[in-house]
Swiss-Prot record:
One of its GO terms (biological process) is cobalamin biosynthetic process. Its EC number is 2.4.2.21. GO terms for molecular function: nicotinate-nucleotide-dimethylbenzimidazole phosphoribosyltransferase activity. Keywords: Cobalamin biosynthesis, Glycosyltransferase, Transferase. The keyword Glycosyltransferase applies. Pathway: Nucleoside biosynthesis; alpha-ribazole biosynthesis; alpha-ribazole from 5,6-dimethylbenzimidazole: step 1/2. Transmembrane segments: none annotated. It comes from the Bacteria. This is Nicotinate-nucleotide--dimethylbenzimidazole phosphoribosyltransferase. It is an enzyme of class 2 (transferase). SUPFAM superfamilies: Nicotinate mononucleotide:5,6-dimethylbenzimidazole phosphoribosyltransferase (CobT). It holds the Pfam family DBI_PRT. The active site is at E312 (proton acceptor).
Amino acid sequence: MKTFQITRPDETIREALTDKINNLTKPKGSLGTLEELALQIGLIQQTLTPELRHPQNIIFAADHGIVDEGVSLSPKEITWQQISNFLHGGAGVNFLCRQHGFELKIVDAGVDYDLPYEKGIINMKVRKSSRNYLYEAAMTEEEMNLCIERGAEVVRQCHAEGCNVLSLGEMGIGNTSSSSMWMTCFTHIPLELCVGAGSGLDNAGVHHKYNVLQQALDHYQGDGSAHDLIRYFGGLEMVMAIGAMLQAAELKMIILVDGFIMTNCILAASQLYPEVLHYAIFGHQGDEAGHKLVLDAMGAKPLLNLGLRLGEGTGAICSYPIIDSAIRMINEMDNFAHAAITKYF
């Protein structure tokens, strides 16, 4: 598997960043999370004047073999149909990208359909759909490695275009099931607490989904390593997102983490490279059952709670103005000395 050089941001500059933030014309700590974000981004970028450049949202798309077991309300053709909607600018993620100045990239990681690549979709297809992990591993070792490498390749291109802040989204009917499997495997939270309605299952549907996933977990006979669990239960788009996250961290980019699926992707990525979490900002707590639990297990503080459960990167993009405010705070606020204000704390 491709290896990455991911290190914790150098702490040498922390004191200078903290002093700058504390000497802005406000009571110490009074801008709360904005101050925390400015400090985190300053550490990532190793500067007292951090900046956000050319924000991009990458949607990785793929189909899932486990959908054959009736774990999703939506049929798998919704995956390619929604990609068509992205191309025509009519999806939720499209208006948010337009509103907040994000470039949108759509990546075919493993959609079970012949997509129109000439319309701008990035063709990184590893295979048409993952396999059904109720009976066998979702992907081979070679396919997993290709996903990691191709996700990293997409991010290197984003970085070459001047991007230093990256939101990651997904499109793949059945991917909440893979997310629930990773969540229970890596946090040891009982599976029943990790399984939710996904795109809209009723109580009976959720119960069936849980039973299928519990059978898959019971049948698993791998070595239990993070690498093997990612390969066995993962989605092609999710593993590609892991590669993207790891490459972004190596390049010292800011990673905006979206909802339940992307949170479990960075959870899985952190099993391989724990330092990746230093580069992550968690955009929101979504409405999918289990999202709060996995965020809490990671010690993550999401910026928003809007009851979202769409995916695509929508929650991460919604949080972007808050992050922009943190950058404007550290760069545009005056300090006590220059403003001739007595420092009163």
